[in-house]
Swiss-Prot record:
Domain of life: Eukaryota
GO MF annotation list: dihydrofolate reductase activity; thymidylate synthase activity
Name of this chain's protein: Bifunctional dihydrofolate reductase-thymidylate synthase
Keywords: Methyltransferase, Multifunctional enzyme, NADP, Nucleotide biosynthesis, One-carbon metabolism, Oxidoreductase, Transferase
InterPro entries in UniProt: DHFR-like_dom_sf, DHFR-TS, DHFR_CS, DHFR_dom, Thymidate_synth/dCMP_Mease, Thymidate_synth/dCMP_Mease_dom, Thymidate_synth/dCMP_Mease_sf, Thymidylate_synthase
Binding of substrate, residues: V30, D52, Y162, T180
Taxonomic placement: Eukaryota, Discoba, Euglenozoa, Kinetoplastea, Metakinetoplastina
Species name: Leishmania major
Record GO cellular component, one term: mitochondrion
């Protein structure tokens, strides 16, 4: 929470919670099909592959950490009524999962009527009937009751539900397709799911395959694959890294590590419908991103405040040794000087150390931006700068991401941001910066009653540190997944008072983290 007095904070409007949740929940598909895209006859599956049934159970039941569901967290399976009825009674509802059945007429009581009477009350806790199609189910799963308690939503059939999944508005929320390909043709099939669909607007990438193997039951050959929609936005980042490493020039730098560098690039990321561009080809430290951005917004300059939260991204630049090397011998250890947050909230004020009270001192650029957006959204001077030439020598590190310009689309009521970053560490810094300015744009949009629009990231000296080359080559081999969603579980009276725990990133399916050393 901000130390500032209330009159110096930015009050949040009554509309602050309007876009706290997405319109529809992201989801995945689990399906098995033969060589003619057949999935069944409407009542049963015309092949026997026990390994696929085991995969289905594990994939839809276990959480992403491969642990079983808990009272607070489980997955959901969405199915049509015929698919529900095709499940043997003894397995209804599917254990350990929230079963969402799409039906215009059935009730929970009717669906559970075939069960022994003594089991119905407990089973009712695991079944929800949605009067509508897949979109209505995803709308329900995007609401507060389920957004945090459901980790992954799986669409499991039948044919009409799969067909709906491949059409708007559902297709925009489809993150993964787990497909078991049966290397045979079942003449009994009367229901089909062509995947990948021909002439589809969405391109699909094969993310993984367990390899073609033979079932121990009937000897059928099968292959379990995972497909993901092509993430063109993350590919911008990967392609830029590849271009830097192939065509950039080798340069020495102040850290002594050395870089491969090129000058001038740009990437664009959509923030619409709660989308958060948190890179997936490696796990990005979201907690660090969020806490640092809130630290900026509060005008704080003590790295110790972050270290106390076990966030050590500024420790190197706040060390006694580093401060002394910058000539900042009078700064207390971990006092970074008038860096980002100070310039955002107190531009031009005389810096007297991180412990001083700066209420009302300098230019509060963030507050000015919020007020101007609300009163004059067409203003072309909606800029925030951290680059103060008069204060650079007092900073532990001059700002790398130094200028943000905001833009209001008055036709769509969307707020977009263009970030200019002079020095761009592609391996460590840039993934952080993308997510950080996405969050800043989302919060400013909340404070001004607008929807988040787009983040445009303009890079000056875009470079790869030489000691990051091998790690980045490994990252380039990975297939990007869909970006996650940011939700707000709690709201605050003032912009500066939002906390990490008020937000949650859901449907984030990244590859493992990749260790890279920070050049100090």
């Amino acid at each position: 929470m901000s130390r500032a007095a209330a009159r110096f904070k930015i009050p949040m409007p009554e509309t602050k919670a309007d876009f706290a949740f997405p319109s529809l929940r992201a989801f995945s598909i689990v399906v098995a099909l033969d060589m003619q895209h057949g999935i069944g006859d409407g009542e049963s599956i015309p092949w026997r592959v026990p390994e696929d049934m085991t995969f289905f159970k594990n994939q839809t039941t276990l959480l992403r950490n491969k642990k079983p569901p808990t009272e607070k967290k489980r997955n959901a399976v969405v199915m049509g009524r015929k698919t529900w009825e095709s499940v043997p009674v003894k397995f209804r509802p599917l254990k350990g999962r929230l079963n969402i059945v799409l039906s215009s007429k059935a009730t929970v009581e009717e669906l559970l009527a075939p069960l022994p009477e003594g089991q119905r009350a407990a089973a009712a806790q695991d079944v929800v009937v949605v009067n509508g199609g897949l979109a209505e189910a995803l709308r329900l799963l995007a609401r507060p009751l389920y957004c945090s308690s459901i980790e992954t939503a799986y669409c499991v059939g039948g044919a009409q539900v799969y067909a709906d999944a491949m059409l708007s508005p559902c297709i925009e929320k489809l993150q993964e397709v787990y497909l078991t390909r049966i290397y045979a043709t079942a003449p009994a099939c009367t229901r089909f799911f062509p995947f990948p669909p021909e002439n589809a607007a969405t391109a699909w990438d094969l993310a993984s395959s367990q390899g073609r193997r033979k079932s121990e039951a009937e000897g059928l050959e099968f292959e379990i694959c995972k497909y993901v929609p092509r993430n063109h936005e993350e590919r911008q980042y990967l392609e830029l890294i590849d271009r830097i490493m192939k065509t950039g020039i080798v340069k020495e730098d102040r850290t002594g590590v050395g870089t491969i560098s090129l000058f001038g690039a740009q990437m664009r990321f959509s923030l619409r419908d709660n989308r958060l561009p948190l890179l997936t080809t490696k796990r990005v430290f979201w907690r660090g991103v969020c806490e640092e951005l809130l630290w900026f917004l509060r005008g704080e300059t003590s790295a110790q405040l972050l270290a106390d939260k076990d966030i050590h991204i500024w420790d190197g630049n706040g060390s006694r040794e580093f401060l002394d090397s910058r000539g900042l011998t009078e700064n207390k250890e971990m006092d970074l000087g008038p860096v980002y947050g100070f310039q955002w909230r107190h531009f031009g004020a005389d810096y007297k150390g991180f412990e001083a009270n700066y209420d009302g001192e300098g230019v509060d650029q963030i507050k000015l931006i919020v007020e101007t957006i609300k009163t004059n959204p067409n203003d072309r001077r909606l800029l925030v700068t951290a680059w103060n030439p008069c204060a650079l020598q007092k900073m532990a590190l001059p700002p790398c991401h130094l200028l943000a310009q905001f833009y209001v689309n008055t036709d769509t009521s969307e707020l977009s941001c263009m970030l200019y970053q002079r020095s761009c560490d592609m391996g460590l810094g840039v993934p952080f910066n993308i997510a950080s300015y996405a969050l800043l744009t989302i919060l400013i949009a909340k404070a001004t009653g607008l929807r988040p629009g787009e983040l445009v990231h303009t890079l000056g000296d875009a470079h790869v540190y030489r000691n990051h080359v091998d790690a980045l080559k490994a990252q380039l081999e990975r297939v990007p997944h869909a970006f996650p969603t940011l939700i707000f579980k709690e709201e605050r009276q003032y912009l500066e008072d939002y906390e990490l725990t008020d937000m949650e990133v859901i449907d984030y399916v990244p590859h493992p983290a990749i260790k890279m050393e920070m050049a100090v």
